[in-house]
Amino acid sequence: MVLFLIALAAFFVVAAVILYWLLGTNRYGGDRPAQALQLTASKGALAQGALKPEPCRTVRVYFIKPSRYDEEGYVQFFRYGVQPNNSLTALAALNEAFNRKFSAERNVHLDTVIWDEICDGVISPETITAIKEKAHEDGVELLIGMAGVQSNQYPRGRDIALQFKALGVPVMMGGFHVSGYPDSVKFLNECGITAVVGEAENLWGQIIEDYLRGDLQLHYSVKDGIRAKTGRDDIIVPLITDALLPVLDDRYLTRFFNEQMTTIDTSRGCPFTCSYCSVKNVMGRTMRSREPNAVVTWVRDACRNHGIQSLFLVDDDFFRSPRWEEILTGLIEVKKEFPKFSFMMQVDVDASCYANVAEGETETAKHRRSQRFTELAAAAGCYMAFIGIESLNPDNLNFATKYQNTDDRQHKLKLEDARARVINKYRRVVDNWHKVGVSTHAGYMLGFPFDGPDCGRIAAQTLRKIKFDIVSFFIMTPLPGTEDQVRYAKEGAIIDWDFNNLDSQHVTLKHDKLDRSSWMQAYRDAFTGFYSIPRLLHTVLTVAAGRQMSAESRRSVLRQFIYYFFSYRQGRHPMVGGIWPILRRDIRRIAIGDDEARRLYLCGMRFGAILRGEGNGFAASPA
């Protein structure tokens, strides 16, 4: 048995070396061109007669998910991505719905092209020109939608949008950044770019109608729905009970390391008030759920017709979905039909913390709910639960208003006693998930006000003892649209306004106890402490030998641990990276701030100079 384990460890070490080569080898040039997808209707759509009428007015809609710029200003691009983007597939579904409903009646058809820049290919000025020329050649109209744009992707998305706009192409932008940061909306509108604020389901029909009439507006936001509280005020959010489910595209899935994995959101919103998080301010604190039967039917179809075996429920907190029990019960039936089906999800600490009745506790409805949830999740095929624990220090948790991770009694306790209670709570979370065979993935932030230079080392050491399987570490970042961003901006504590650096691995704030160097060292200490070489070997041996988890949980932990081990050492956060980087040296960032980008792309050099490679490199204007 010992020899077998040694041989197994050697195998995984060799595999790790190969993965290191894939992760760390830059390929200069030789970039595969992205295949512009003309998304065909799904089987259901074909059955309902959604085929393109001939001849008809055709609008080719590009949904583009921008990448971001790396440290040297090059666009991040990988041969394989790590996770399909849910926004792209959800938006494609809206076009299909329009075609099913209106194509024949209105003699209008929407062609859909989805382009995920991180794995489909870098969009160069030549690409933009070719897209317009191809549309003209095919006799179709062109509409560009920058989709699901996060703050660290905004500079890249803005640059692409402005280049399309310079050629006279109508452009829209949506996502968390524009939904949470009015200043960027104002800038885009000044440039003639439409901003779509909030969720698109209730807006898309009106957007297309306005476009077809030649009256595309500069600003769209949700007007019909329910009122939901945020961290600051109230917003209107749409009900999603009957919202369209994402379109599965087999071509898109081949761009990812695991092409049998996809994503879906079954609910939206988050009831909590964490000050660093933008979810509650964009989607509200009122939980809304899709119809469970529709979700289960979609998953079954994905398994049967697209070979899907792994699913990521991208709900911000699936445990708080009002329909989780019905969905999990349905997924249990899917698991019986497709034994290889499994999924991961994001939940809060209470999802498993009270699945056991600890000494001195009396069983309550909270315990029964937690126990029911963990048992159903495991039976339905859950292999990993992502839990945002964020800090071990109760003072930090209270600062961030993340009260769900603390114990009410700790307000009367000394700090060390309160900290011990927090750690004990996290230990219960992990133990209860492991008891039902589910692995755990923690999210942890470094740089709260009560953190010091040793916060990374202490975090790694403690999280190892608690027995979290995977940990994603993040540098505390003032994301636009959050209470933290408003607070730090008012205090003058934001030292870096380049949105490209809001990726949770750059220092962008002043800190009373940490300078930039010690903060980055704490970040490195956390990663190298948790993902050390001894721990890599230990994980290979103990996880492969069993250790209380399901087979898919063990495989997932092995894959992710090795991937995280090397990805961090290559200077890339695993959640925003990919496999096998490809470097396009001919495409490099020129503009930093919004005004500089406007002068460059709309008022200045235009494409001739850009294509000749002229520019001023990295300018230092404020964002």
Regions found by a protein language model. Give the residues of each.
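Radical SAM [4Fe-4S] cluster-binding motif and immediate context
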Residues: 48, 59, 239-441, 446-448, ...
